Each structure stands twice: as C-alpha cells, then as structure tokens.
From Swiss-Prot:
It is found in: Cytoplasm. InterPro entries: FabA_FabZ, FabZ, HotDog_dom_sf. GO terms for molecular function: (3R)-hydroxyacyl-[acyl-carrier-protein] dehydratase activity. This is 3-hydroxyacyl-[acyl-carrier-protein] dehydratase FabZ. The gene is fabZ.
C-alpha cells in the first residue's frame, strides 16, 4: 500500500459523516495518512463563542464541555475509518462504542482551535480501536482511547 497524505474540506466531511449543525464537530481535516505503517488523521474544530452550548455552559465563563471534545475525537475517528475503507453506504452508521482512559488537562473556551489527532490501532469483529489527543496551541487538553463500530441500519 502506498502512503496517502490528504486534506478534506467541510463538504467532503459531510459526505462521510451523518452529523450536521449544531452537532458536526469537525470543521476540516488538515491531513490524513494511510500506509502500512500507520493510519492517522489530524482534524480541526474551531470553538466559536456562537456555539449553542455556551448559552448554558457557562454564561459567565464559557467552557466547551469535555464530552463534546470526546465527540469531536469520535467524529475524527469516523472520518479516518471511512477514508480507510471507503465512503459509507446510505444504510451504514458509525457508532461511538466506548471510551477508556479519558483525561482532561485544561478547559477549552471560545476562540480556541482544537487540533484533533487520532490514530487507528486495530480492528476486531467489526470494532475499531483508536487513540486520540486534542490540543490547543500545542498544549494537550484531552487524551482518550476510543472504540467505534460500523453497523447497518
């Protein structure tokens, strides 16, 4: 297999994921690499003050919820998975199955740009395992191990 390094815009992301505003958590894919040695993807989530979640979390000191950072990571793994195996059919969904060892290092707020780095580790019985690291300005804000499953609906 040859090495691929590519980027994806929002329309290409929307072709791969069923999520839409306000729950689409990936704005662009800066690059991904699929080779025999590694399968990785770097995605971007721009955190805007206009995010609906900031109306209640928290109005005086907006904090982007950790669970949404994890959702952004999970969406990045879905994009990576579908770039590895091809675009999903209309009756396929990619489910976030589990998360292990999630750690939050610092809060994320309006104006931050989340850089989401995910790596495919292995697949067994239709369940894929990934690692994920989210950073802001080079500083780690969240790490986790994620498992996802592609299923017919």
């Amino acid at each position: 297999m040859t090495t691929e390094k590519k980027s994806l815009g929002i329309q290409e992301i929307m072709d791969l994921l069923p999520h839409r505003y306000p729950f689409l958590m990936v704005d662009k894919v800066e690059n991904y690499e699929i080779s025999d040695e590694r399968k990785t993807l770097r995605a971007i989530k721009n955190v805007s003050f206009n995010e609906p979640i900031f109306q209640g979390h928290f109005p005086a000191k907006p904090v982007f919820p950790g669970v949404l950072i994890l959702e952004a990571m999970a969406q990045a793994t879905g994009i990576l998975a579908f770039t590895m195996v091809g675009k999903p059919s209309p009756n396929e969904l990619y489910y976030f199955a589990s998360i292990d060892n999630a750690r939050f290092k610092r809060p994320v707020g309006p104006g931050d740009q989340l850089v989401l780095d995910v790596e495919f580790l292995k697949e067994r019985r239709g369940i894929a395992k990934f690692t994920g690291v989210a950073t802001v300005n080079g500083e780690v804000v969240c790490t986790a191990e994620l498992m996802c499953a592609k299923r017919e609906v």
